Each structure stands twice: as structure tokens, then as C-alpha cells.
Amino acid sequence: MNSIGIRGGVSGSSPIGELETQYFQEYDVMANWSMPWEWYSASGWGVGTRLMGSVGAVRASGDTAFVTTLVPGFVFGRKDGWLSLEVGGGGALLSQHRFAHQDMGGTFQFVWDTALRAKVYRGIGLGYWFHHLSDASLYGHNAHGFDLHMLEVSYRF
């Protein structure tokens, strides 16, 4: 494991053009593991792979659902984690998929994450995550996902 942290965020304008019918919030605890595939230059810059997992809660219109994610991805930046851009895609499980004004279709959802993360003091880091959950039409065209803008506080080992 190379980092642990907490994240929290809210839905907002989406750069991918989907409209949520709810205002969503998500809070979770996350962990990142380095995977063995990487290439870094002598200067320390390069690309690596990681596996990110999280457990937390999603809220909308007074409804709260348990959410867990598992997202493999790529890390672009310095090997020491001083600054990185992370991109990944994976899966999520929700304990409920119907909220007051929005049906997400089913328990399983696809996840797309993009994160900008930086160390700010010793092992302590801050990050911004764009977090997209949707069924990718797995449950039909009437289901809607959501996009979150999340902030992270983490500790890197």
C-alpha cells in the first residue's frame, strides 16, 4: 500500500455532458496500492500503475447508500508521489440504486476517475478527483449516473 486517505465531494457541472436529476454527495475512505508495472526515468518522472479501492457513503435527497469501488489505473508523474496525474476505470457496488428522483439502474456501476494529487508536507497529500459513476446503459437507457468533484486528504508511505 502506498497511500490511504479520506475524500469528500459533491455533484456539479459535468464535463461529459450528462445531467443528474439529484444533488449527490459522497464521502469515503480510500487506499492506493502500487502495481508492479512502471517506467520511470533517472530524473524520477514517468508512468506507473496502481489499484485504488474505497468504501463510503453516497447521499441524495435524504437517501444514503453504501458504496465500494475498485479501480485500476495509471499514474503519471514523479515516482516519489510529489505530483501525479492519475487516470483509472473500474467498478463500484451500491447498496441501493434508487434515489428520490434518480434511478441508477442497478447495484453494479462503472467508475471513471481522474485525479491530480500532490504531497504538501512530508507524507501528507492533497488531491482533486473527478469521479464518474454510471451503468454505461447496462440496465437500459433510462438509468442515470452522476459525476462528483471530490477533495482528498491522504498520507503517503
Model-based region annotation:
Residues 1-37, 148-157:
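Short glycine/proline- and aromatic-enriched beta-strand/turn motifs that initiate or cap beta-hairpins
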Residues 6, 27-35, 55, 70-78, ...:
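Residues on the lipid-exposed face of transmembrane beta-strands in outer-membrane beta-barrel proteins
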Residues 15, 114-157:
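Predominantly the C-terminal beta-signal and adjacent terminal strand-loop region
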Residues 15-18, 58-60, 98-102, 136-140:
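Extracellular loop and loop/strand-boundary signature of outer-membrane beta-barrel proteins
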